[in-house]
Amino acid sequence: AEVIGADYAYLLFEFPPQQLPQAVAGLKALGAAGFNVTMPYKQAIMEYLDEIDAEARLLNAVNTVRIDENGRLYGSNTDYFGFRQSLKDAGVPVEGRRVTVLGAGAVSGPVWLTLSEERAGHVTWLNRTLDRAEACAAQMNRRSAGIADAALLTRENLNRQIRESDLI
C-alpha cells in the first residue's frame, strides 16, 4: 500500500473453516476494504458474496473480495488476471501454440481458462496424479473441444513434451 500511496494494511488472519461466516462478518464490521482468501476457502467464500465476476463464477473460485461502502461483497479471481497479464507482459503468444502445463493444482483453473481464451492450439497437462490432469483437460475440452489431453508427469512424458511443445 505504501508504494502506491494508499493508507491500507495487509494482515494475515488464520481461522478454522467452520468460522468463515464469523470471519467475513468481522471484516465487514471492522470496515475492511477487502480481503484475499486461499484454499480451502476459494469455493466456500462464494456463498457469502453479493456479486461474483464472470471469470470467478466460471472457475468456481474466488480469491479476492472487495467490500464497498455499503458493506456489499464483490468476489473475483486475480489468479486468472495475473496469469493472463503475465503472458501479455512477457510477449508470449499463445494462439495456435502447443502448450504443456506442469501441475494441476489450485491455480489450474485460471491457467486453463486463459489458454482457452487465448486459443492455444493444443494443451497437455502433466501431473503426478493422472486424475487431476484429466480433470483439467476435461474442463478445457468442455470449453474448446479437443484442445487438451493429460498424462502422468514422468521423465519420459516430460522429455517428449519438451521436444513437442512451443510453450511450457
What is the predicted role of each segment?
Residues 77-80, 87, 92-120, 127-128, ...:
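Glycine-rich adenosine-cofactor-binding loop
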Residues 2-90:
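Phosphate/diphosphate ligand-binding glycine-rich loop within oxidoreductases
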Residues 136-145:
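Short, conserved SAM-binding/catalytic segment
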Residues 44, 130-135:
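Short, charged/polar "capping" segments at the starts of alpha-helices
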Residues 35, 99, 168:
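Receiver (REC) domain switch-region micro-motif
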Residues 152-168:
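Rossmann-like NAD(P)-binding element
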Residues 16, 85, 145-155:
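Short gly/ser/thr-rich secondary-structure transition/capping motifs
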Residues 32, 96-97, 120-122, 164-165:
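A general structural motif
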